[in-house]
């Protein structure tokens, strides 16, 4: 593995870690309606489990409601059951093929729990970034040992890997700070 490929590989892995964090944070309920809350909901449909988005269209008519428009009338009870089983703290209100999900306001205690969880996700991501950095530094040592790069070049590349790690770590901090503000906004 050459040094350019190594840097590109490290950057891709760090970008992937950031995407995982984004996905985890989207699942946190902020008191504001978002169809992403229902990403984890699966529905028993046509003999198999399917994501909710494959049997209904999802929309947010206002900041406190999610509408689930079920395409097949026979699926309404399955969709309700799937939403209830997902344990999201949402109570489905059915009106024909339309299921309304009012988003209850978050209590101060629940907001604090969500902020702690967001920080935990952030810390897990930083641990991933440090592991990626460690793997990169080990690969650099191997390149130096195999005489592919010189000692001073190894030092320079190590600094670049550290800078890359610092950059992504600060991105994680800003994403978490933004999510914290979103959660704490009443």
UniProtKB/Swiss-Prot annotation:
Keywords: Cytoplasm, Protein biosynthesis. Its main location: cytoplasm. GO terms for molecular function: ribosomal large subunit binding. InterPro entries: Ribosome_recyc_fac, Ribosome_recyc_fac_dom, RRF_sf. Transmembrane segments: none annotated. It is found in: Cytoplasm. GO terms for cellular component: cytosol. One of its GO terms (biological process) is cytoplasmic translational termination. SUPFAM superfamilies: Ribosome recycling factor, RRF. Responsible for the release of ribosomes from messenger RNA at the termination of protein biosynthesis. May increase the efficiency of translation by recycling ribosomes from one round of translation to another. Belongs to the RRF family. HAMAP family: RRF. This is Ribosome-recycling factor. It comes from Rickettsia peacockii (strain Rustic).
């Amino acid at each position: 593995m050459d040094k350019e490929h190594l840097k590109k590989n490290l950057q891709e892995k760090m970008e992937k870690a950031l995407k995982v964090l984004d996905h985890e944070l989207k699942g946190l309920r902020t008191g504001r309606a978002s169809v992403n809350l229902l990403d984890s909901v699966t529905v028993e449909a046509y003999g198999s489990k399917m994501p909710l988005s494959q049997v209904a269209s999802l929309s947010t008519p206002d900041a406190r409601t999610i509408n689930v428009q079920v395409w097949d009338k026979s699926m309404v009870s399955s969709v309700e059951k799937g939403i209830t089983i997902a344990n999201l703290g949402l109570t489905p209100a059915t009106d024909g093929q339309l299921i309304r999900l009012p988003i209850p306001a978050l209590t101060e205690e629940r907001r604090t729990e969500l902020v702690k969880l967001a920080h935990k996700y952030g810390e897990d991501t930083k641990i991933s970034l440090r592991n990626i950095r460690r793997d990169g530094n080990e690969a650099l040592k191997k390149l130096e040992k195999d005489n592919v790069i010189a000692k001073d070049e190894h030092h320079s590349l190590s600094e670049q890997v550290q800078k890359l790690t610092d950059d992504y770590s600060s991105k994680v901090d800003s994403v978490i700070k933004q999510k914290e503000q979103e959660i704490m906004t009443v």
